[in-house]
A protein has these predicted regions:
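Carbohydrate-associated surface elements
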Residues: 103
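N-terminal glycine/serine-rich phosphate-binding loop of ATP-dependent small-molecule kinases
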Residues: 1-96, 122, 149, 196, ...
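FAD-binding glycine-rich core of flavoenzymes that anchor FAD
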Residues: 116-120
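Short, compositionally biased low-complexity segments
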Residues: 32, 111-114, 168-169
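Surface "functional belts" at beta-alpha junctions
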Residues: 99
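Short, charged, surface-exposed secondary-structure boundary motifs
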Residues: 40-43, 108-112, 182-184
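Acidic-glycine-rich active-site phosphate/pyrophosphate-binding loop
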Residues: 33, 108, 210-212
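Gly/Ser/Thr-rich active-site cleft segment
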Residues: 8-10, 121-212
Length: 212
């Protein structure tokens, strides 16, 4: 059995094809890495965003390369940079850049107000660093930066999964969900009451699964 894997990193996008041997161990048939190179230049020093559609295009090209060379691949695994989010519309299309884990909007002081990350810590008793997806989303809500057509959000690798499968609503693994912040790792769910307190419409939250 052959398996292909794609990892969407911040600086590179990597892929690998593995074959399961008779002894049960995996053998690497081929690995390949391409530059990400999709950062968007903005006038804000604190802003770290990337062209999401260009990232997906590069990931698709890499996966297509593997599938053409190894047509008997049976499974595809996706991993990628944690914490960041992209917004999607009702059809499952990406309608925003990728707000990466390096984005610092959660640390900005608006006038005499404390940074959003500190407000979350004080009001919700949650530690969520700037760059965590839900910190980014709360900031975007308050500053009218959420795209008008957006209805949900997810990580870049989960969006790639949506792109490949035609899924319209985001479905993310618990490991990715935890990286967005406001996640109860014992109950395996988002802390909806605290999110609502911060002004988040919980209907926007992606579905969460525990299985791979």
């Amino acid at each position: 059995m052959k398996t292909a894997g794609i990892d969407i990193g911040t600086t590179t996008i990597s892929g690998v094809v593995l074959k399961k041997g008779e002894n049960g161990q995996a053998k690497i048939l081929e690995a390949k890495t391409v530059e990400n190179g999709c950062f968007v230049e903005t006038g804000n020093d604190w802003e770290r965003i990337q062209y999401a559609k260009e990232i997906v295009k590069k990931a698709v090209n890499l996966l297509d390369y593997f599938l053409e060379k190894y047509p008997d691949v049976e499974r595809i695994g996706l991993t990628g940079q944690m914490h960041g989010i992209v917004y999607v519309d009702k059809e499952g299309n990406c309608v925003s850049p990728l707000y990466t884990w390096q984005d610092a909007r959660g640390n900005i002081c608006d006038g005499d107000q404390i940074p959003l990350t500190e407000e979350i810590r004080e009001r919700c008793k949650i530690h969520a660093a700037s760059g965590y997806g839900l910190v980014t989303h709360i900031y975007n809500i308050r500053h009218n930066l959420v795209p008008d057509s957006a209805l949900s959000f997810c990580t870049i690798m989960d969006y790639f999964g949506m792109y490949l499968t035609g899924r319209k609503k985001p479905l993310i693994h618990v490991s990715n969900a935890a990286g967005l912040g406001f996640f109860d790792s014992r109950k395996m769910c988002f802390e909806k009451e605290k999110l609502a307190e911060m002004g988040v419409d919980v209907n926007w939250l992606p579905d969460v699964c525990t299985e791979i």
